[in-house]
């Protein structure tokens, strides 16, 4: 138990000697420096240096008399003080590193992401940084894993629009159900995800290969613009189909199958990106 407490105090930036002295005072106080050394096992040659460090840091109080006596800050107060100090440090770091944000958001690079979980984690981070609009193409199987972040963004006033492959229901997003979800899944033999945030960054890739899934994240305008516009073009098409499906299917077949086949390069009319 004592060893565990020593480790905990070390995690709170106590040295080993400081930890032993503080624990000794928690068990019994007030004590003289000599008594603290005897009770804690800290060498007498080091004890006053250790106690002075604790006093300066505010973890121990000292009464200045003929024989100084030491008492510890109560454990609850110590934890509260450490938590407040840590929050101050985080606030300072956040303000300091803000000026490097633009450098970190390098608009010239394209970054590869490997693994389905890693791809979805990046998408979550992008979602939470969006300020105005999110455009997303996603399968039902993957939607649930980022739904909480999407809802949080929507509650912050971000407009969320989803092209859904599969039956996705949402009370916070504009959802366009793709009528050909099953056909497309079979045709491609896989699932992709395309995210665009604020017309300034995109994540796009295949998410159906588990650890072998691949995606790219970028703020490069040469990719952000066309990928975002492809999503918007799909939305245009879905709005047109909603109003003129009968007319269009009369010309191009059910679910526009003739168009899909017209622009296929394979005799089986399937996609072979994953081969």
Swiss-Prot record:
Pfam families (alphabetical): Regulator_TrmB, TrmB
Disulfide bonds: none
UniProt keywords, alphabetically: Coiled coil
Signal sequence annotation: none
InterPro entries: TrmB-like, Tscrpt_reg_TrmB_C, Tscrpt_reg_TrmB_N, WH-like_DNA-bd_sf, WH_DNA-bd_sf
Coiled coil: 75-157
Organism in which the protein naturally occurs: Bacillus subtilis (strain 168)
Protein's UniProt name: Uncharacterized protein YrhO
């Amino acid at each position: 138990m004592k060893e565990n407490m020593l480790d905990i105090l070390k995690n709170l930036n106590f040295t080993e000697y400081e930890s032993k002295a503080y624990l000794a005072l928690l068990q019994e106080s007030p004590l003289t420096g000599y008594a603290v050394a005897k009770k804690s096992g800290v060498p007498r040659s080091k004890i006053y240096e250790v106690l002075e460090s604790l006093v300066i840091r505010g973890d121990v109080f000292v009464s200045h008399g003929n024989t100084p006596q030491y008492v510890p800050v109560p454990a609850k107060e110590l934890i509260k003080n450490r938590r407040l100090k840590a929050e101050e440090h985080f606030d300072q770091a956040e303000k300091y590193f803000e000026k490097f944000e633009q450098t970190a958001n390098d608009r010239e690079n394209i970054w590869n992401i490997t693994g389905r979980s890693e791809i979805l984690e990046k998408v979550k981070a992008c979602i939470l940084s969006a300020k105005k609009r999110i455009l997303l193409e996603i399968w039902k199987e993957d939607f649930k894993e980022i739904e909480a972040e999407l809802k949080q963004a929507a509650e912050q006033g971000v407009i969320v629009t989803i092209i859904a492959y599969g039956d996705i229901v949402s009370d916070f997003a504009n959802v366009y159900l793709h009528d050909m979800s099953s056909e497309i899944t079979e045709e491609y033999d896989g699932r992709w995800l395309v995210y665009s945030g604020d017309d300034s960054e995109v994540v796009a890739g295949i998410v159906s290969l588990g650890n072998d899934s691949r995606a790219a994240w970028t703020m490069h305008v040469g990719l952000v613009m066309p990928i975002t516009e492809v999503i918007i073009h799909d939305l245009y098409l879905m709005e047109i189909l909603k109003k003129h499906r009968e007319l269009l299917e009369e010309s191009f077949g059910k679910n526009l199958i003739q168009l899909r086949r017209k622009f296929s390069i394979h005799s089986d009319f399937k996609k072979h990106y994953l081969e």
